[in-house]
């Protein structure tokens, strides 16, 4: 049980698949708070099935003692609350869906006494970039701190799950090994 002044953080990730970039985000967030809730998107609309993604995140964060992994269920970043994430709609629709999803998150955050929300910088996905912008705006009025963490980069630039999926598809396991934790590479 954490004290009343504890900093409690939250990260929501699809982790399709779990990369060194995801691990970096969790490390940065965990270092900044007393307790970090990591939510893995439950929607099974990804290359890597949810059960595997959740296992990879849990295994990839097992050494971080202040991290607790959860599934989002049908409540956060789901087809019910944020269909634009899966459909890639217009900016206006994305913004309204993001606001709805963030309102759901705020209810869960209140129940878990979350004080800080962490997201990775998003240079690649328009939908996620808009979501992060709306989230920063919405959280500013609630007293929740919003932290946008710069992406982990390697010699090829920012590490992205999209790039990792391409490496998997192309069978480029040498490059893949440099971008994912051992648990993901074994998968």
Task: Write out the residue ranges for each language-model feature.
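Nucleotidyltransferase catalytic core that binds NTPs
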Residues: 1-187
């Amino acid at each position: 049980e954490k004290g009343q002044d504890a900093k409690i953080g939250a990260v929501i990730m699809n982790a399709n698949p779990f990369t060194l970039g995801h691990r970096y985000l969790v490390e940065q967030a965990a270092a900044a708070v007393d307790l970090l809730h990591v939510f893995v998107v439950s929607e099974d609309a990804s290359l890597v099935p949810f059960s595997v993604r959740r296992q990879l995140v849990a295994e990839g964060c097992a050494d971080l003692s202040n991290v607790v992994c959860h599934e989002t269920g049908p409540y956060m970043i789901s087809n019910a609350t944020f269909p634009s994430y899966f459909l890639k709609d217009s900016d206006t629709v994305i913004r309204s869906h993001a606001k709805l999803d963030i309102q759901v998150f705020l209810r869960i955050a209140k129940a878990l006494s979350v004080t800080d929300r962490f997201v990775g910088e998003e240079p690649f996905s328009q939908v996620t970039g808009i979501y992060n912008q709306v989230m920063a705006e919405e959280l500013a009025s609630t007293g929740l701190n919003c932290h946008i963490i710069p992406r982990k980069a390697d010699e090829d630039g920012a590490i992205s799950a999209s790039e990792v999926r391409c490496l998997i598809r192309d069978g480029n396991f040498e490059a893949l090994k440099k971008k994912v934790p051992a648990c993901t590479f074994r998968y």
